A protein has these predicted regions:
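N-terminal and secondary-structure boundary signal
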Residues: 1-234
Length: 234
């Protein structure tokens, strides 16, 4: 996250609702983790400015990855052979990604899979952006796979992004346990929204013409059953 308001960064209100939902189901040892990019550190200050710290006060423990221990783990990736991630991320029961619905001027878009960059050590992120960014962000997920991905798409960036962009109402929230299926559906929704505003740009009607999603499928992040997903209105 940066200190920019939603949808550039996590909505404090949505985060608070998620924590309340988890607590209502009897969960108490809830940790909210984040790590900003090099130019915005320390994350503690960003979280306070963005309203994240206040949103979970008394409900969950804030964990600022840049203040903790890191572990370098090997990856079976094509473009990333190792990644340095927070030690705490490897020692939790479940990982929930709370992502937004928005375009990204370098990675095309940022949903759940792209959120995994937040687990990467800040000093490694500059190298990440030098080449093969779209493929590399996907491969980070091999180290810290999400058990549940939530896309807060009430408002979306339909151009620009990630910190500044054209915001339009999308009016949706997506959630699922299959990271590829969630991001594919998020892409379809964003593509339709961009088309509505005549902003298709380099986006394709076929999600798998986009490098992030095609590479995620190649990496097996959706398993073998992801094509059978269905959308259920709640």
């Amino acid at each position: 996250n940066t200190s920019d308001p939603y949808p550039a960064s996590t909505s404090p209100e949505m985060l608070a609702e998620l924590v309340d939902l988890l607590r209502a189901r009897g969960l108490r040892r809830i940790k909210v983790g984040d790590c900003s990019w090099n130019g915005a550190l320390p994350t503690r200050n960003v979280a306070r400015q963005a309203g994240i710290t206040g949103a979970v006060a008394g409900k969950a423990k804030m964990v600022f990855f840049d203040e903790g221990s890191w572990v370098t783990v090997p990856l079976p990736g094509t473009f990333l052979k190792k990644v340095t991630v927070p030690e705490i991320a490897l020692n939790v029961d479940r990982i929930i990604f709370l992502a937004n619905l928005k375009t990204h001027f370098l990675a095309d878009f940022t949903f759940g899979l792209k959120l995994a960059v937040g687990f990467m050590h800040p000093l490694e992120r500059s190298l990440l952006h030098q080449e093969r960014l779209r493929e590399k962000v996907v491969e980070i997920n091999l180290a810290v796979p999400a058990d549940l991905t939530i896309i807060d798409g009430r408002t979306a960036f339909v151009s620009g992004g990630p910190a500044r962009g054209r915001a339009e109402k999308a009016g949706l929230v997506l959630a699922g346990t299959n990271p590829l299926a969630v991001d594919v559906e998020a892409y379809r929704q964003l593509y339709n929204l961009k088309k509505q505003h005549q902003l298709e740009e380099s986006f394709s009607a076929d999600p798998f013409q986009m490098i992030q999603l095609s590479h995620a499928r190649e990496c097996g992040l959706g398993g073998e059953t992801w094509p059978g997903y269905t959308c259920v209105d709640l």
